[in-house]
Amino acid sequence: MTSPQKAILAGGCFWGMQDLIRKQPGVIATRVGYSGGDVANATYRNHGTHAEAVEIIFDPQATDYRTLLEFFFQIHDPTTPNRQGNDRGTSYRSAIYYLDDEQKRVALDTIADVEASGLWPGKVVTEVSPAGDFWEAEPEHQDYLQRYPSGYTCHFIRPGWKLPRRATAGQ
């Protein structure tokens, strides 16, 4: 049996990100928190330069990192710096926090495909950085939209959105 793998993604308010990602095939568990910033023991009221992020545990036999990233780019706008919908500020930036060189390679390759696809109107501004500490958010933020199904979100699945792979040299 293959061990579960982890991904850490930020794409705006973590409530909507978690709610959609948790429903994807192969996702075992999710939790929301703060990552990519400068404050130890980050909290909602004091998270410094951290982004609101989702930690995803997934079964690599049921899904892969690339598939998770494709979904990530479908449910948030990666072309708006420090913003998703009405949410503004560095907390709401688009970011991929990779855990190893392979995740970094897949992230950069997926971003190149997003850029080449023209599915988004502008240049992708998604930050790609090594994963640092992930500070779990307070209990009231975990599984928020499961507890409050009509709660706030600015994330949605875009029907018919399919990321093509770009043609690369040597194919």
Curated annotation (Swiss-Prot):
Gene3D superfamilies: Peptide methionine sulphoxide reductase MsrA. It catalyses: L-methionyl-[protein] + [thioredoxin]-disulfide + H2O = L-methionyl-(S)-S-oxide-[protein] + [thioredoxin]-dithiol; [thioredoxin]-disulfide + L-methionine + H2O = L-methionine (S)-S-oxide + [thioredoxin]-dithiol. One of its GO terms (molecular function) is peptide-methionine (S)-S-oxide reductase activity. It is an enzyme of class 1 (oxidoreductase). Keywords: Oxidoreductase. InterPro entries: Met_Sox_Rdtase_MsrA_dom (IPR002569), Met_Sox_Rdtase_MsrA_sf (IPR036509). Its EC number is 1.8.4.11. Has an important function as a repair enzyme for proteins that have been inactivated by oxidation. Catalyzes the reversible oxidation-reduction of methionine sulfoxide in proteins to methionine. Belongs to the MsrA Met sulfoxide reductase family. PANTHER family: PEPTIDE METHIONINE SULFOXIDE REDUCTASE, PEPTIDE METHIONINE SULFOXIDE REDUCTASE MSRA 2. This is Peptide methionine sulfoxide reductase MsrA.
